[in-house]
């Protein structure tokens, strides 16, 4: 083994995300001398990231080298780790298209990156590019491990392991560890005192056990405390990012009904189910404080904040950041050194969760060490949780089949099976919506869709 790994970042123009991941990497002793290859098709954004990464590296006392690439295969050559984080079509035009076309057809969305027409279109735009990365990896770094952060996570991960089963990859999200920290904050307890077991699908996994350590070293179930805090109006706390639009009511109400807390945010969960966003039901939007059009608003704000941050980074002598909650550096360190760690990853369901479809993409705890990323068996999850997940897996199954077999009919079927879409639109309206989305996206979508 070489003394230091090569880490390739595809989509390195996502500077804020690069900063978080590589800020963690540079503080790990075994990774300090890594060769970091930054790749993006946008040369301006690439140069911005280079400035930030160089200062991060110097500030952390890391001694590796940085190379910048607009050619993907060159960036991937002999890589040990491949971090993927990009958005095909960006906020403009593609995200705007997903929201505006759906709205014209009477379908409101909040985030639109995981399920529903927005998630379906994003998958169709994204998967061909992920496949090209797999092709290049097969040729120039076949032993590398891909750490995929691109949404829609389940469909993307599924499409890659279905077509390129030899590529070592895991889909990563921060919702499991992020929500655990959020719940600890709601109860004014130290996140380090938590112990939990979580399982499901990406953006719809549930804490099957959620406990905290007491003074005498024993663990107690945290759910009764959490429910009492919500009923007393003491939880949830105001949004940690200062976003007053996102008040987390949906998840707590679902917790009361289901008995288990879900990992992804209220604004996400509201559009994965048929109960919260309906035509003419402004009362539901008000009661559950559902932030419609949240993702476009967030994109505009983040872009404005980034320009301000970038100017500060350009003039700063040092860039010092706190550790992020992302798993990437933990995985790299465990694979490179053999020092074991546990992360939550999105992987193929091969006997991991018994009552979800085998072959579907599930999110479970994984042991990571020199043997690789090893998912752990969960067994059977509560039937009502599995039933809810199945409604989302239906969409993922059909969309993945659509793109693997180039079958346009399955795209309509995937949209028909989406719980939120089906609760709002009739069948003919769903077909018309899909037709308009395909026409509006044009060349951003695969050619077979437009034949």
Q: Can you annotate each of these PLM segments?
A:
Residues 132-214:
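Internal, well-ordered domain-core segments that constitute the primary functional module
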Residues 65-78:
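Short acidic low-complexity segments
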Residues 29-31, 56-63, 164-165, 187-189:
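Short helix-capping segments at alpha-helix termini
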Residues 188-451:
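Long, compositionally biased stretches enriched for glycine and/or charged residues
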Residues 30-54:
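NAD(P)-binding Rossmann-fold cofactor-contacting core
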């Amino acid at each position: 083994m070489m003394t230091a790994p090569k880490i390739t970042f595809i989509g390195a123009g996502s500077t804020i995300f690069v900063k978080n991941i590589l800020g963690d990497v540079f503080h790990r002793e075994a990774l300090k001398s890594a060769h970091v290859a930054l790749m993006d098709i946008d040369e301006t954004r690439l140069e911005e990231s280079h400035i930030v990464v160089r200062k991060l590296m110097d500030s952390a006392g890391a001694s590796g080298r940085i190379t910048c690439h607009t050619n993907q295969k060159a960036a991937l050559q002999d890589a040990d780790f491949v971090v993927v984080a990009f958005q095909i079509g960006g906020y403009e035009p593609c995200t705007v298209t997903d929201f505006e076309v759906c709205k014209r057809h009477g379908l409101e969305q909040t985030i639109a990156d995981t399920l529903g027409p927005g998630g379906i279109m994003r998958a169709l735009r994204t998967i061909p590019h992920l496949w090209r990365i797999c092709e290049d990896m097969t040729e120039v770094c076949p032993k590398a491990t891909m750490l995929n952060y691109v949404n829609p996570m389940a469909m993307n991960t599924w499409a890659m392991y279905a077509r390129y089963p030899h590529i070592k990859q895991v889909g990563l999200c921060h919702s499991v560890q992020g929500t655990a920290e959020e719940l600890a904050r709601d109860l004014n307890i130290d996140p380090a005192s938590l112990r939990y077991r979580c399982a499901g699908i990406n953006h719809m996994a549930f804490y099957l056990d959620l406990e905290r350590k007491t003074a005498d070293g024993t663990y107690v179930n945290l759910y009764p405390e959490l429910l009492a805090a919500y009923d007393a109006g003491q939880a949830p706390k105001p949004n940690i990012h200062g976003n007053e639009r996102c008040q987390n009511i949906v998840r707590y109400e679902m917790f009361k009904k289901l008995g288990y807390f879900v990992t992804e945010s209220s604004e996400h969960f509201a559009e994965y189910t048929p109960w919260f966003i309906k035509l003419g039901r402004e009362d539901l939007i008000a009661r559950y404080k559902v932030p419609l059009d949240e993702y476009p608003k967030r994109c505009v704000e983040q872009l404005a904040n980034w320009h301000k941050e970038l100017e500060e980074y350009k003039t700063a002598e040092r860039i010092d950041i706190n550790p992020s909650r992302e798993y990437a550096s933990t995985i790299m360190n465990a694979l490179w050194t053999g020092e074991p760690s546990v992360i939550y990853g999105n992987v193929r369901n091969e006997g991991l969760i018994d009552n979800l479809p085998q072959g579907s993409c599930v999110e479970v705890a994984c042991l990571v060490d020199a043997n690789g990323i090893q998912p752990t068996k969960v067994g059977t999850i509560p039937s009502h949780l599995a039933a809810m997940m199945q409604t989302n897996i239906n969409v993922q199954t059909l969309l993945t089949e659509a793109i693997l077999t180039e079958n346009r009919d399955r795209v309509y079927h995937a949209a028909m099976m989406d719980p939120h879409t089906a609760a709002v639109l009739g069948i003919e309206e769903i077909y018309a919506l899909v037709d308009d989305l395909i026409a509006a996206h044009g060349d951003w979508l695969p050619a077979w869709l437009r034949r």
